[in-house]
Amino acid sequence: MTLLGSEHSLLIRSKFRSVLQLRLQQRRTQEQLANQGIIPPLKRPAEFHEQRKHLDSDKAKNSLKRKARNRCNSADLVNMHILQASTAERSIPTAQMKLKRARLADDLNEKIALRPGPLELVEKNILPVDSAVKEAIKGNQVSFSKSTDAFAFEEDSSSDGLSPDQTRSEDPQNSAGSPPDAKASDTPSTGSLGTNQDLASGSENDRNDSASQPSHQSDAGKQGLGPPSTPIAVHAAVKSKSLGDSKNRHKKPKDPKPKVKKLKYHQYIPPDQKAEKSPPPMDSAYARLLQQQQLFLQLQILSQQQQQQQHRFSYLGMHQAQLKEPNEQMVRNPNSSSTPLSNTPLSPVKNSFSGQTGVSSFKPGPLPPNLDDLKVSELRQQLRIRGLPVSGTKTALMDRLRPFQDCSGNPVPNFGDITTVTFPVTPNTLPNYQSSSSTSALSNGFYHFGSTSSSPPISPASSDLSVAGSLPDTFNDASPSFGLHPSPVHVCTEESLMSSLNGGSVPSELDGLDSEKDKMLVEKQKVINELTWKLQQEQRQVEELRMQLQKQKRNNCSEKKPLPFLAASIKQEEAVSSCPFASQVPVKRQSSSSECHPPACEAAQLQPLGNAHCVESSDQTNVLSSTFLSPQCSPQHSPLGAVKSPQHISLPPSPNNPHFLPSSSGAQGEGHRVSSPISSQVCTAQMAGLHSSDKVGPKFSIPSPTFSKSSSAISEVTQPPSYEDAVKQQMTRSQQMDELLDVLIESGEMPADAREDHSCLQKVPKIPRSSRSPTAVLTKPSASFEQASSGSQIPFDPYATDSDEHLEVLLNSQSPLGKMSDVTLLKIGSEEPHFDGIMDGFSGKAAEDLFNAHEILPGPLSPMQTQFSPSSVDSNGLQLSFTESPWETMEWLDLTPPNSTPGFSALTTSSPSIFNIDFLDVTDLNLNSSMDLHLQQW
C-alpha cells in the first residue's frame, strides 16, 4: 500500500512539472497584456486620466441622483429647522445660524423642563454654599430659602421643592453622598448640567469638569437664545461668575461612606450585625397569615403522629390513661412557668395579636448541646427562626447560635398547663371568654386551638383557618384528635407549639394597635348588627309560615290520632354561615354525659364542628348498634371556628367505615327503674345555639348527632296498619304538603324546583316487614343508615306511618335560611304508644342518676355541660330543657318509643329507646319552628 501511495505522488508531481513548463513557454509579454487591458501600461497616457475623471464624476452624479430621490419633503425639513419656512432671499450663513439657534432653543427648553432644583444642586455639590448651610440642608433642619441661594434663577423662585421630574434628573456621578439620591439617570442629568452651564454663561465650566458639554452647544447658548427660550436674569449670571471666580473651583468634600468593594458571590460579607437587632416590621395581616400557616402545618403533623400512636395501642388502657393522667397533672401543677393568656387583663383583640407581630416572635425550640452535629441548612433554619442573618461559613453560623444555646435551658411548660388560646371578635363576648378560657385549660388533656384570625378574611383559604375546624375535614382519614395523650414522644413538640402560642410579644407592643383594632371592631359590629337584623326578618317569616302550618295541622289532624314514630335525621350542612365574624363562645356542659368509644378503633362521635355525647344504659344483654355519621360541612362552607371547648375529636367516619357503638351489659340501670322493667338508652346530641340579637348568647357549630337504636321485646309486637290505610294517609298528607309548598314558592321562601324534590322524597321504595334482606338502605346514599345486630343485619320499614315529616325536610333543605342536603328520615311506627309514662315514675334524683350513669361506658368527663331538668317531663316522654340557650324555651323533640316491629325481632334486648334528636343548622335560626313542627305533627 505504501509503495502504491509513493508511486502515485510521483506521478502527480511529474504531471505538475510538465504543466508548469508548458505555461511558462506560452505566457504573454507585458505589452501584450497592456494592449489587452489586463494590466495598466507602464507609462499612462493623458487619455487614461481623463477617463478616470469621467468615471468619478459619473459616480458622483449617480449618488446625488440617488440622494435626491430619497430626500425628505420640504415641510419635514422646515419642521426640523433645516430649511427656512419663508421664501425670502437671505444670505446662506445667517439662515444657517438662525436654524441652529432654533434647534438649540428646542433642546434647552427640554433640558430646562427636566433640570434639578436649587436644593438638589446644593446637595450634589454643584452650587457652592457655606458648609454650615449645606449641613443644615442635608440634615433637613433648615428649609431652603431664597436668600441662601445665590444661583437661583427666576424660574426657581416659585418652587423650591422637588417635583417628580426633578427627582428623576439627579447627577449619578455625584450621588454617592446620600442613598436616596442614587436613583438618577444619565441623560437628563448631563442635559440639566448643560442647561445650567449655558444659563450661567459658562461660569461653571471651571467647576464641573466631569459634566462639560461640547463647545459648540455652550457657544450657541452664549450667542443668544431664540424666542422659545425662557428669559435669563442677568444679575444672577454676573453674581455667579464673580463668585465662581473668587471661590476658584469649589472642591467637593469626600464622601463619608467608603466605596464598597465589589465581591464575588462566594466572598459575601454580611452587613453590620447592629442593624439586624430588630427585624424589619412586617405587615400585621401578612404576619398573621404566616403564623396561621405555620400553626396549621404543625397541627397537621401532630394529628398524623397522634393517629399513628392511637392505632398502636389498644383502646381501653389508653383511654383510662387519658382519663387519669391529665387530671392528675391539673391537680399537681395548677401554676407553672407558662402564664396562660386568659389571665392577662387585656382585651380580646389584644389577645389575638400576642405573638403575631412577626414570625420572629415565635419561641424557637431548644438547641442541641453540640452544634457541630447540625448541618448548615439546619443551622440556617435556627438562625432564621431567631431573626438572625443566615449567611457565612458554618463556624460563623455556630458562633451566632451559641448565645441562644446557653439560654435554651428554660423550663418548658407542663402538659397540664397549656392554655386554650381563643381570639374572640366581638367585645360583648369578653366575660364569657375570660370565664371559660380558664376552665378549658386542658382539664382532660385535650387542648383546642381557636381561630387565630381576628381580622377580616384575607382569602377564602386563610379566613377559614380556625385551626381545629379545618383540620379534621381536610384530612378525612387522619385522626384529627387534638386530645393528644401525654406520651414522652409528642409532649415536647406540643409544649413548644403552645409556648409559641402563649408567649412572644410584650403587651407594650399591643398598645399601639388599639386605635386600629377599635375601628375594626366598630366595622365588625356594624356587620354583625346588619346580619342580625336580616336573620330576625327571616325568622319572622318562618314564624308566620309555622303559624300557617299549625292552623292546617289543627284543622286536618283533629279527628284522627297520629301514630308515634322514631325519627333519625342525618344531615349534611352546605350553607355558608351568614355571620362570618361571629366568634364562638365555649358552652359549659356538665360532665355527666360520658363519651362513647368503640373497641376496635376510635370512631367519631365528634365531628370537627360539634360533638355528641352518648349515654347508654342497657340491662342484662349487649345491644350492638351500628350507625353511620354523615360528615359535616367542611370549613370553607362554615367560617365559624370550632367549638372552643376541650373535646375529644377522633376519626371522622365515612360511609365505607361503619363504626359500632357498644353498650355494656350489667344491672346498672336496674336500680333506677321504679315500675317499668325496661331500661332506657339515651343518646343526647349537642345542641347548637341561636345567634341572638344581644350577641351574648352562645353560638355553636354544627353538631353531628350520633344515633343508637334498640328494640323492645318480641312479646309486645303489634301489627302495623294495613297498606290501604297507609296509602290514604300518605295521600292526604301529600296534598297538605303541596298546598304548603305553593305558599312557600309564592312567598319566595323556596325555589320553584321544591315540588320536584318533594315528589322524589315520596317515591322512596317501600320495604315490606316480612322480608329478611340483610340491609335496609334508603335512597340517598350519603345519608345511608344501616342497622346491625351482632349476628345479622335486620330490615325495618321506614314507611309504616304517614309521610308528614317530609315537610320539615323540605323546609330545611329548600329555604334560603339553611339548606339541608341529603336528609333521610327513618320512622318506625306502631298503633299505640306503650311506654308513654316511662319517665313519669322517676324522681328527679333517679332521672339524674340515669343520665349520669357514666360508669357503664368508660370515658373522660367532658367539660361541655348539659343541664337536664328532670322536672320537664310530661306524659308523652322525656323533654330536655337547654338552660343556657338564649331562646325562651328550647322545645326538644320528645319521642316515645314504639312497639317493636317484626323487623327488629333479632335484636336481643327488651329495652326501648327514648331518643332525642336535633338536626340543626348554623344559619337556620328557626330552631323553635323546626322543633314545634315535629311536636305539632306528632
UniProtKB/Swiss-Prot annotation:
One of its GO terms (molecular function) is transcription coactivator activity. Residues 371-405 form the SAP domain. GO terms for biological process: cardiac muscle cell apoptotic process; cardiac muscle cell differentiation; cardiac muscle cell myoblast differentiation; cardiac vascular smooth muscle cell differentiation; cardiac ventricle development; cardiocyte differentiation; cellular component maintenance; digestive tract development. RPEL repeats lie at residues 18-43, 62-87, 106-131. Ubiquitinated; by STUB1/CHIP at the C-terminus, leading to its degradation by the proteasome. Phosphorylation by GSK3B is required for STUB1/CHIP-mediated ubiquitination. Residues 153-205 are annotated as: HDAC5-binding. Residues 48-68, 154-281, 635-678, 693-734 are annotated as: Disordered. Gene3D superfamilies: 6.10.140.2040, 6.10.150.10, SAP domain. Induction: Up-regulated during end-stage heart failure caused by dilated cardiomyopathy. The modification Phosphothreonine is found at T896. Expressed in the heart, aorta and bladder. Expressed in smooth muscle cell-containing tissues: stomach, small intestine, colon, lung, placenta and uterus. Very faint expression in prostate and skeletal muscle. This is Myocardin. It comes from Homo sapiens.
